Every structure is written in structure tokens, then in C-alpha cells.
Design a protein with these regions (language model features):
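Conserved alpha-helical scaffold segments that buttress catalytic/binding sites
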Residues: 2-232
Length: 232
């Protein structure tokens, strides 16, 4: 499922650009040759959700995010079976919330997030920075693991939320200085869950990856590929 929108980042006072991710992905993906390592016959392309207007201001962007939440949840409910795995490409991190609402309705759910930000901002208004705040508040998650957080991107209020016993986390700086390994942390988290586990890969966790929170410091693309191959 492609989602070409930028209202989530705009409602969070971020930069535009997330609306272009699916177009960049699809140019390559839809020209992929069949090869035995990946069962392409098991993949279905449902379509693309496309933003057709820009919000006039932040309040309108917030309202549009709420409308998008409902649209994505309806789309998943009507067209994706409980035993299928939806893969969302593009858009802001706000789209994690309707995914979690859909998945948790079909059974217990935990999520692992590779992210420089915890996405635990206050729930006073919807935007790309508070999907997991809403998910925990609504009781959608059994556990939440977020790895590769950047110290400078997570304030005292967010760090206080990280003390929640449902949350497992580690800062990117800990990986730079200590004996910790991302792969070990994520596989350890997943192995302790006895139910469905969702995966979010935030593009700003990858060094030099174009995103609304671009950073030259982060994981390499090959490290993320290795992680996903191991999880698969």
C-alpha cells in the first residue's frame, strides 16, 4: 500500500517530502525481476492513497491527519485479511496508528521501531510524532521496542515516558560507545513476544537517507537490510 502524503509531518512542524517516497519506491519495485529468494507471487499491490491538497495551516493539517487515520483503517479493514501482512510505503509516521488499530483488532500486538525519535509526543493533537503515544493510551500494544534513539532528539518528557515497563529502548549513542548490537536487541525483543509483532523502519534512522529529520549519523542501509533479512 502506497501512501503519498505529508500532512503528518506538517502537523508536527516538519518538512515536506514524505509524499514522494512511494513514487521513488515504485519505479524500482514494479520493475523487479522474478527471483526465487523472494516469493513475489505472494505480494499484492492494493493501491495508493494520495494527498490532493495542502493544508492551509497547522490546525487543518491536524484535521487531515485524523481523516487519513480513518481512511487507512477503513482501507485495511475492508481489503486486508487478518492473516495477511500489510506493508506501508511512504507518508509520515502518523500512518503507524491506523495500522496498529487494525492489527490489534485481530489479536495481541507488539511493535519494534527503528527510529531516531520515540514518537511519544503528547496526544493533544494528531501528527507524525505521537502514533505510539496514542497506541499505548488506547491499549493497542502489549509492548513497544524502540532502538537507535538519538539523545538530542528526545526531550525530558519523552525520556520519562520511556520508563514505562511496556517500553524497551536503547539510544544510538549507547551502540556507539558500548558492547550493544542492534540486531541482538531487536531479535531479543521479538523472541519474548508470543503474538504478532509489527515493524516500523523510520527513514531518519538511516544515515543520509532523505527524510524530514535528515541526519548524517545513523544506521547504514546494509545494517537495516541485514536486520530485516534476519527478522524474515
Amino acid at each position: 500500500i502506497g501512501i503519498s502524503e505529508n500532512v503528518g509531518p506538517q502537523a508536527n512542524l516538519g518538512r515536506q517530502g514524505s509524499e514522494n517516497a512511494f513514487q521513488a519506491f515504485s519505479k524500482v519495485f514494479f520493475n523487479t525481476q522474478f527471483y526465487p529468494e523472494v516469493p513475489l507471487q505472494n505480494l499484492s499491490y492494493l493501491g495508493q492513497v494520495k494527498q490532493i491538497k495542502q493544508p492551509l495551516d497547522r490546525p487543518e493539517a491536524t484535521q487531515m491527519v485524523q481523516e487519513l487515520d480513518r481512511l487507512i483503517l477503513d482501507l485495511l479493514t475492508q481489503h486486508v485479511a487478518p492473516d495477511q501482512i500489510p506493508i506501508i510505503v511512504g507518508g509520515g509516521h502518523n500512518n503507524a496508528l491506523p495500522l496498529m488499530r487494525w492489527a490489534s483488532a485481530n489479536g495481541k500486538l507488539s511493535v519494534v521501531n527503528i527510529d531516531a525519535h520515540a514518537d511519544l509526543r503528547p496526544t493533544d493533537k494528531r501528527h507524525s510524532g505521537n502514533s505510539f503515544s496514542f497506541a499505548l493510551e488506547e491499549g493497542l500494544l502489549e509492548n513497544y521496542g524502540v532502538y537507535g534513539l538519538h539523545e538530542a532528539f528526545n526531550n525530558a518528557a519523552i525520556r520519562n515516558q520511556l520508563t514505562n515497563p511496556q517500553i524497551s529502548h536503547r539510544f544510538f549513542e549507547d551502540y556507539l560507545q558500548g558492547p550493544y548490537q542492534l540486531l541482538d536487541d531487536v531479535l531479543g525483543f521479538v523472541s519474548h513476544q508470543h503474538h504478532a509483532v509489527g515493524i516500523e523502519i523510520d527513514m531518519d534512522s538511516i544515515a543520509y537517507m532523505p527524510s524530514s529529520a535528515f541526519s548524517p549519523s545513523g544506521w547504514s542501509l546494509d545494517q537495516i537490510r541485514t536486520l530485516l533479512l534476519k527478522l524474515g
